Design a protein with these regions (language model features):
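Short recognition patches in nucleic-acid-associated and regulatory proteins
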Residues: 130-155
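Conserved P-loop
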Residues: 1-66, 108-119, 132, 156-177
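Catalytic-core regions built around general acid/base machinery
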Residues: 19, 88-96, 116-123
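Short acidic/histidine-rich motifs immediately flanking catalytic phosphotransfer sites
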Residues: 69-73, 79
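Conserved ATPase-coupling elements of RecA-like P-loop NTPase cores
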Residues: 78-93, 108-114
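Structural recognition of the conserved hydrophobic beta-strand(s) that form the central parallel beta-sheet
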Residues: 75, 99-106
Length: 178
């Protein structure tokens, strides 16, 4: 089990795709949450445009029944949208001999750790923490700045809605939802 985490625009999906592209396509199955409709409905796509065909699922529980028998690597993008339930699903896949790579944000726009992060650190064999370049000053960025009005803790968006920021340039949004 490998977890790739960090702020937005840190290269999480690019790293996930790199892992997926190392094996023959028939041995890899990518998954993405149905809520993520940004670039393509049926593919995991990086901000730079790299893509890999994906199975779209509504919940973590929908992943195991959709795994093809030839699969030796499950690549799961936007893992933070699946919540803590994904941890148990991934552990089950690993027990069945399937390697798993999960790409996920580590914190929300308020700088709060997503609930599953502590569990991931406990169960992952490898945790790769990535950073980006601050959109304001060019220093190392570990935070995600929301640029548009916030309606919920988890909101899908790209460069029109978010940008990476360093600790000094990041400002928490006015009010955090529960």
């Amino acid at each position: 089990i490998t977890l790739v985490c960090g702020c937005m625009f840190s290269g999480k999906t690019t790293e996930l795709l790199r892992s997926a592209e190392r094996l023959p396509a028939a041995r890899v199955q990518a998954f993405k949450p149905a809520i993520d409709t940004r670039y393509a409905l049926d593919a995991v796509v990086s901000h730079a445009g790299r893509a890999f065909p994906a199975t779209v699922v509504d919940s973590a529980a929908a992943i195991p029944p959709r795994i093809r028998t030839s699969v030796s690597l499950a690549a799961i993008d936007e893992g933070h949208f699946f919540g803590v339930e994904l941890v148990e699903v991934v552990q089950g896949l690993a027990r069945c001999g399937i390697d798993v790579v999960v790409a996920a944000l580590d914190r929300d726009s308020w700088g709060r750790e997503f609930p599953a992060m502590r569990r991931w650190v406990d169960v992952a064999d490898t945790v790769t923490g990535l950073s980006a370049v601050c959109a304001r000053c060019g220093r190392e960025a570990t935070r995600t700045q929301r640029l548009t009005p916030i309606l919920d803790r988890s909101m899908v968006g790209g460069p029109e809605s978010y940008e990476p920021r360093c600790e000094g340039c990041w400002k928490a949004p006015p009010e955090a939802p529960p």
